[in-house]
From Swiss-Prot:
It holds the Pfam family EFG_III. It comes from the Bacteria. Keywords: Cytoplasm, Elongation factor, GTP-binding, Nucleotide-binding, Protein biosynthesis. This is Elongation factor G. GTP binds at residues 17-24, 90-94, 144-147. GO terms for biological process: ribosome disassembly. HAMAP family: EF_G_EF_2_B. One of its GO terms (cellular component) is cytoplasm. InterPro entries: EFG_II, EFG_III, EFG_III/V, EFG_IV, EFG_V, EFG_V-like, EFTu-like_2, G_TR_CS. The gene is fusA-1.
Length: 704
């Protein structure tokens, strides 16, 4: 099957937003207008197509980034009349599902940032915006819910500029706001669009209403000045008062959007069917195709030499697996983005991350959770493969004769853990396998066994994250489990630098054991994890024993010296040592490495760390004092406060250990009128009195 659409007419986009900005409804409307849906599903009725997990339908929030494909032919603009393929990744807006947003942004060429015209820029919008900045994703902004009481387009534009540090340039302004929202002025064509009151999908083009002429002129000048600054020819025309064509404006707007220097802003009400078609035109006009994104960089798995691949079908096949999902009908699905080349169904691919070769059984293009078989997928496509057993999120799939490893995805470490116990013997048998499947899908979800108690512990990014995973155990895998109290994932590190000798000797006749290492341990900056450096000179320790020393150190780091928590952000340098020709072995050096590290860590001013969360609360003014007092009482540090959409907001940094059950407390404190968001910020040293209490607790547990 040949390529259906030329590569420069493909758009891989994400829709990113805060919860309740209307993301799922907007996606539904896109699918409806592009002919993919015959009936629209409303989130508040629990019928939306993109939200295909049971809990998503129940909770009205999107958890997994479902991928779907559709076609659109713009009516206006530089690409009018040309058919385009749009692949949409629907991303969740809840902060516990950061990993879903992160991995979708990695494979996108552009995004539609959705804002609620009433709420403006919410805390989660900032988080997602920062993630998009990290990956340099071009964006257009769509101010949704213009029909709601209290909607304010211009305040939202101002908030995008002030709170997100972006450069928003409206290319539309609304005709009426709130209940009187009737349409918009197109500032490029200088025409009014009035929607049919009964059916928002039909509209009439009109002259700009008299009372809006001045405002429209002002905002058009604002737009022209913004684009003229980026193009000398346009600037000259503008300064000389010459006419600038629609095509010229769109061309420079596109360049500026792709360069992430401008964010074109549109408005609408997806629920009322107003604005979605024009937003789709803007996706085609201003967001990148895989061709604009250009080459992708990677390296040779053997030589580490840099390799570059062009987004062309003729290039060798290279793709990134960005999501693993379990489908009730076909089993394990691997979602992947093709960066170069062609993949035929039934062919073999090399997983260059692991070095394993696997056969792709079938290739599916997903429409939400419905499937469409494809014989082949091409550069720029997003699809799902059936039959890949050992692929994990972030792995590279490629042509085995031309191997390449693409840049890996980096995921945050979990900050909260709970114990799970199966309710029955039958549940016990299925628990391990079910948890392993969930961990395959989600890299921020970890499963481990507590060696002291034998309990199974699951770790994740927040209470809601773990709650939903336990819920999935029950629904998808039919495993009933009792859940313990949430526990904080404390960590340990060191503050000083120490050199220490680790020695393991057993020599009492016959074959003995001998390993001696000298280690230097020192702190690394936060988030760097662990670094091992081999500085052995003159073969005082043979090369084959050095990996064993490293393994011994890493094993010792799992069980810290302050209170037995894992250690992090430490650099260890192996500077000297001794070996015995007969008695030395890998095991002896592994134990010596472990002894040396433990001894050094005890002397290097070890400290206990706790996860600190960034908390934002939006509350009516009358509860502000109570909310702030409560946060301070939780060892919180108030960072800032201000007004937001008729309410007050407070931002604070609070230890995670103090935030369990906060949603219930906040609800009762404010009669359910406040809401909050919380995300992991960093690890910070635990105050001495709390560290001592934790140590006693651990020691007490050990002596039981």
């Amino acid at each position: 099957m040949a390529r259906q659409v030329a590569l420069d007419r493909v758009r891989n986009i994400g829709i990113m937003a805060h919860i309740d900005a209307g993301k799922t409804t907007t996606t539904e409307r896109i699918l409806y207008y592009t002919g993919r849906l015959h009936k629209m599903g409303e989130v508040h009725e629990g019928g939306a197509t993109m939200d295909w997990m049971e809990q998503e339908k129940e909770r009205g929030i999107t958890i997994t980034s479902a991928a779907t494909t559709c076609f659109w032919t713009p009516k206006y603009g530089n690409y009018a009349g040309l058919n385009h393929r749009i692949n949409i990744i629907d991303t969740p807006g809840h902060v516990d599902f950061t990993v879903e947003v992160e991995r979708s942004l990695r494979v996108l060429d552009g995004a539609v940032a959705l804002f609620c015209a009433v709420g403006g820029v919410e805390p989660q919008s900032e988080t997602v915006w920062r993630q998009a900045n990290k990956y340099g994703v071009p964006r257009i902004a769509y101010v949704n819910k213009m029909d709601r009481v209290g909607a304010n387009f211009f305040e939202t534009v101002k908030a995008i500029r002030e709170r997100l540090g972006a450069n928003p340039v409206p290319i539309q302004i609304p005709i009426g706001q709130g209940e009187v929202f009737a349409g918009f002025v197109d500032l490029i064509r200088m025409k009014g669009i009035i929607y049919d009151k009964e059916d928002g999908s039909t509209y009439t083009e009109v002259e700009i209403p008299h009372d809006l002429e001045n405002e429209a002129r002002t905002w058009r000048i604002n737009m022209l000045e913004a684009v003229s600054e980026l193009d000398e020819t346009l600037l000259e025309k503008y300064l000389n008062g010459e006419d600038i064509t629609e095509e010229e404006i769109r061309t420079v707007l596109r360049q500026a959007t792709l360069g992430v220097t401008i964010v074109p802003v549109l408005c609408g009400s997806s629920f009322k069917n107003k604005g979605v078609q024009f937003m789709l035109d803007a996706v085609i006009d201003y967001l990148a195709s895989p061709v604009d994104d250009g080459e992708v960089e990677g390296h040779d798995p053997k030589t580490e030499e840099p390799i570059v691949r062009q987004p062309k079908d003729e290039e060798p096949f290279a793709a990134l697996a960005f999501k693993i999902a379990t489908d009730p009908f076909v089993g394990k699905l691997t979602f992947f983005r093709v960066y170069s080349g062609v993949l035929n169904a039934g062919s073999y691919v090399l997983n260059s991350t692991t070095g394993k070769k696997e056969r792709v059984g079938r290739v599916l293009q997903m429409h939400s959770n419905k499937r469409e078989e494809r014989d082949a997928v091409y550069a720029g496509d997003i699809a799902a493969a059936v039959g890949l057993k050992d692929v994990r999120t972030g792995d590279t799939l490629c042509d085995e004769s031309k191997p390449i490893v693409l840049e890996k995805m980096v995921f945050p470490e979990p900050v909260i853990e709970i114990a799970v116990e199966p309710k029955t013997k039958a549940d016990n048998d299925k628990l391990g396998m079910s948890l392993a499947k969930l961990a395959e899908e989600d890299p921020t979800f970890r499963v481990k066994t507590d060696e002291e108690t034998g309990q199974t512990l699951i770790a994740g990014m927040g209470e809601l994250h773990l709650e939903i995973l336990v819920d999935r155990l029950k629904r998808e895998f039919k495993v009933e489990a009792n859940v313990g109290q949430p526990q904080v994932a404390y960590r340990e590190t060191i503050r000083g630098t120490v050199e220490y000798e680790g020695k393991f000797v057993r020599q009492s006749g016959g074959k003995g054991q001998f390993g001696l290492v000298v280690l230097r341990v020192e702190p690394l900056e936060e988030g760097k994890g662990y670094e091992f450096v081999d500085e052995i000179k003159g073969g005082v320790i043979p090369k084959e024993y050095i990996p064993a020393v490293n393994a011994g150190i890493q094993e010792a780091m799992k069980d810290g010296v302050v209170a037995g928590f894992p250690m992090q952000d430490i650099k260890v340098t192996l500077i000297d040592g001794k070996y015995h020709e007969v008695d030395s072995s890998e095991m002896a050096f592994k134990i010596a490495g472990s002894i040396g590290f433990k001894g050094a860590a005890k002397k290097a001013n070890p400290v206990l760390l706790e996860p600190i969360m960034k908390v934002e609360v939006i509350t009516p003014e009358e509860y502000l004092g109570d909310v702030m007092g409560d946060l301070s009482g939780r060892r919180g540090h108030i960072e800032g406060m201000g007004q937001r959409a008729g309410a007050q907001f407070v931002s604070a940094k609070v230890p995670l250990s103090q935030m369990f059950g906060y949603s219930t407390d906040l609800r009762s404190m404010t009669q359910g009128r406040a809401n909050y968001s919380m995300e992991f910020e960093s690890y910070r040293e635990v105050p001495r009195n709390i560290a001592e209490a934790l140590q006693e607790k651990r020691v007490g547990k050990d002596s039981e």
